């Protein structure tokens, strides 16, 4: 679910992007899909 995707995104994305997307789980999910 979102926590899993957020964790994976954190592993592949720089900390700056992680902090940006971390504000909203839905935004984080969309960011992963767009990448």
Curated annotation (Swiss-Prot):
Keyword line: Calcium, Glycoprotein, Lectin, Manganese
GO MF annotations in UniProt: carbohydrate binding
Keyword presence, Glycoprotein: yes
InterPro entries for this protein: ConA-like_dom_sf
SUPFAM superfamilies reported in the protein's UniProt record: Concanavalin A-like lectins/glucanases
Processing and modification events after translation: Highly glycosylated.
Record-annotated disulphide pairs: none
Sequence similarity: Belongs to the leguminous lectin family.
Biological role stated in the UniProt entry: Binds lactose or galactose.
Subunit composition and interactions: Homodimer.
Name of the molecule in the record: Anti-H(O) lectin 3
Natural source organism: Ulex europaeus
């Amino acid at each position: 679910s979102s926590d899993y995707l957020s964790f994976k995104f954190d592993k592949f994305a720089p900390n700056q992007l992680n902090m940006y997307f971390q504000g909203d789980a839905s935004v984080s999910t969309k960011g992963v899909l767009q990448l």
